[in-house]
Amino acid sequence: MTITLQQLIALSPLLIVGLTVVVVMLCIAWRRNHFVNATMTVIGLNIALLSLYFVGQAGPTDVTPLLRVDGLSMFYTGLVLLASLATSTFAYPWLQGYPDNRDEFYLLVLIAALGGILLSSANHLASLFIGIELLSLPLFGLVGYAFRQKRSLEASIKYMLLSAAASSFLLFGMALIYAESGDMSFASLGKSLSDHQIHEPLLLAGLGMMIVGLGFKLSLVPFQLWTPDVYQGAPAPVSTFLATAGKIAVFGAVMRLFLYAPMADSESVRIVLGVIAFASILFGNVMAVSQTNIKRLLGYSSIAHLGYLLVALIAVQSHQLALETVGVYLVGYLFSSLGAFGVVSLMSSPYRGPDADSLFSYRGLFWHKPILSAVMTVMMLSLAGIPMTLGFFGKFYVLAVGVNAELWWLTGAVVLGSAIGLYYYLRVMVSLYLTAPQQLQRDTPNNWALTAGGVVVLISSIAVLFFGLYPQPLISLVQLAQPML
């Protein structure tokens, strides 16, 4: 098989991140220098992000039977690269005080980003599985990076065992679908799995097992048990990656699968996904209400956010608006999560033991760091879906899709979930403006806004407010992110 120049250009983000992995490995082997390796990582991710412009100029193309590069894959690749860039930036000050090898952290983030990019372009069940594994395996190490802390090690082992079980379900489900259809590419699955075939027992069993595997990766109810513990145990920069790139890349691949294979049109699959979405929205929001740890709270909140996105996924075959909804919602979720976890990272760095993740640590933050508490307030308002923030447009789109698709009970769940969510987001905001306790020690540097992590947090908050007030540029961008059908 000969690879043309157009195919090479289409693969450029993947190739650039792969090359960065090799360069960082060689730098570690030659001489350990934390600053040099962090800089190499950030430069590599930025070049990969810039290369998306040239990928767009080259136009949509099938690189191999496994990968399809089009507007949709470019959009998700961009989001994964932004999340990886933010994770590396937040990790730098945290790693400054880390007593063991620091440089491998960036290596693991880059390999996970490679998996995310592969998932974004996946057009075949094989590339879907390889992408998921390439994304998950480095996360085992990243979650347990603070291994001297019992909670981090416990989170890593828990995530590893449950992830291995979920991957085996996913693989077995793919095997059953292949046994029934004789093909593994998304487009061929769409042709071979016609409506009368979808009720075959073997096929339903395969689909069920795939839903279990993918539900775990997206932390949907009832496969969400790992989420709060892993978010709490993982270092704050790793929780950032888990909440953003880890979810966005998998959701992008699932979107493509549902677009090409008409599984979502099957009534039985719609009902199962509807029940999962309903349970995720209510469970995530109700459980978050009683949390006093901000990382656990954001973990439960992410379960609810993926439940909202599932409403659009159910309607993706029949409603053009659903694709746009997912795009707008994910951008809002990305920037809000980067900002919220970024504040936790800034409060926690450098590595000295547990993160500053209890709500008590944020009590009276406004009187010490007014701009940082304003950023946190904006992020909470956006996650709650309050007008004039980007999160509001995401929720509005989800409700519009739910009404258009006549998913009344799910639309009701979104409204109820948002009302419950407002309560616990307000709890975080109120604690920021209470009287500060005397004995509370804060690690945040006075010049936090001039650090790289501070700049990322400020850019995220500006993006949330700008697109919340003037969403047209974002909507135009999302409309370009069309799949090649």
From Swiss-Prot:
It comes from the Bacteria. One of its GO terms (cellular component) is plasma membrane. Its EC number is 7.1.1.-. It catalyses: a quinone + NADH + 5 H(+)(in) = a quinol + NAD(+) + 4 H(+)(out). It is found in: Cell inner membrane. Keywords: Cell inner membrane, Cell membrane, Membrane, NAD, Quinone, Translocase, Transmembrane, Transmembrane helix, Transport, Ubiquinone. It is a multi-pass membrane protein. The chain crosses the membrane at residues 8-28, 35-55, 75-95, 105-125, 127-147, 159-179, 203-223, 235-255, 271-291, 297-317, 326-346, 374-394, 407-426, 449-469. One of its GO terms (molecular function) is quinone binding. The keyword Membrane applies. Signal peptide: none annotated. It is an enzyme of class 7 (translocase). Its main location: membrane. The keyword NAD applies. GO terms for biological process: ATP synthesis coupled electron transport. NDH-1 is composed of 13 different subunits. Subunits NuoA, H, J, K, L, M, N constitute the membrane sector of the complex. Belongs to the complex I subunit 2 family. NDH-1 shuttles electrons from NADH, via FMN and iron-sulfur (Fe-S) centers, to quinones in the respiratory chain. The immediate electron acceptor for the enzyme in this species is believed to be ubiquinone. Couples the redox reaction to proton translocation (for every two electrons transferred, four hydrogen ions are translocated across the cytoplasmic membrane), and thus conserves the redox energy in a proton gradient. This is NADH-quinone oxidoreductase subunit N. It comes from Pectobacterium carotovorum subsp. carotovorum (strain PC1). The gene is nuoN.
